[in-house]
From Swiss-Prot:
It comes from Morus alba. Has insecticidal activity when consumed by D.melanogaster larvae. Has low chitinase and chitosanase activity. Residues 3-13 form the Chitin-binding type-1 domain. This is Insecticidal protein LA-b. Coiled coil: none annotated. Keywords: Carbohydrate metabolism, Chitin degradation, Chitin-binding, Glycoprotein, Glycosidase, Hydrolase, Plant defense, Polysaccharide degradation, Secreted.
Amino acid sequence: SEQQXGRDVGGAL
């Protein structure tokens, strides 16, 4: 996710 710099399971950059 964007909260995690885009490298989490959310996948959003």
